[in-house]
């Protein structure tokens, strides 16, 4: 089963992924972008080079295609539980050029069975971002991240409606422990 955690930077995805590693020791943990060696190189170029937004979108789509082919599909074939920090949902939400059609091509229509969506309000996001050094995306401001968060939600529910992906929407301001228990229960009900 393929499970993804989605949310803007600062929502707590990475914290939850680390906790899930202790809970689901036999699962394959991965991430997008950069879940393969080639993907790490593409991610580095996409995030650090001065390139057009269209070129950046295609680098991320290339990363997604490689990740699907070399990580996701083999693990699904082996009937493994796959837990990914981000997916095509982030790809579509963060890019102005990344369509569902292009992402379905890149993923060969391999979609997550379950989507965990961590949502955070403006105040919570401000507080969390103030505690860390900001990357290029985070430096675009709170309003930009809240706009991306709305797109994440829209894309997650569109996948639910069109393809039957299950969505668990959570308030990222809940305690780390409560979030972990809800996420683990959501994953377990199909494992």
Curated annotation (Swiss-Prot):
GO biological process terms held by the UniProt record: dTDP biosynthetic process; dTTP biosynthetic process; dUDP biosynthetic process
Annotated ATP binding sites: 7-14
Cellular component GO terms held in the UniProt record: cytoplasm; cytosol
GO molecular-function terms, A-Z: ATP binding; dTMP kinase activity
Transmembrane regions listed in the UniProt entry: none
A Pfam cross-reference name: Thymidylate_kin
InterPro entries for this protein: P-loop_NTPase, Thymidylate_kin-like_dom, Thymidylate_kin_CS, Thymidylate_kinase
Catalytic reaction(s) noted: dTMP + ATP = dTDP + ADP
Keyword terms of this UniProt record: ATP-binding, Kinase, Nucleotide biosynthesis, Nucleotide-binding, Transferase
Enzyme Commission numbers on file: 2.7.4.9
Protein family: Belongs to the thymidylate kinase family.
Protein function: Phosphorylation of dTMP to form dTDP in both de novo and salvage pathways of dTTP synthesis.
Protein name: Thymidylate kinase
């Amino acid at each position: 089963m393929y499970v993804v955690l989605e949310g803007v930077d600062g929502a707590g995805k990475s914290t939850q992924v680390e906790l899930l590693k202790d809970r689901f020791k036999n699962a394959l943990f991965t991430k997008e972008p950069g879940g393969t060696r080639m993907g790490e190189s593409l991610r580095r170029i996409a995030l650090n080079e001065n390139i057009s937004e269209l070129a950046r979108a295609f680098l991320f789509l290339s990363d997604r295609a490689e990740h699907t082919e070399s990580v996701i599909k083999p693990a699904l074939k082996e009937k493994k539980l796959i837990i990914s920090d981000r997916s095509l949902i982030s790809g579509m939400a963060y890019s102005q050029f990344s369509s569902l059609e292009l992402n379905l091509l890149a993923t060969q229509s391999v979609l997550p069975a379950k989507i965990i969506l961590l949502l955070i309000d403006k105040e919570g996001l401000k507080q969390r971002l103030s505690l860390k050094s900001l990357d290029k995306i985070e430096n675009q401001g709170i309003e930009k991240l809240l706009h991306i968060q709305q797109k994440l939600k829209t894309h997650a529910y569109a996948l639910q409606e069109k393809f039957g992906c299950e969505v668990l929407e959570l308030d990222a301001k809940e305690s780390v422990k409560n979030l972990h228990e809800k996420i683990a229960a959501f994953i377990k009900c199909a494992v």
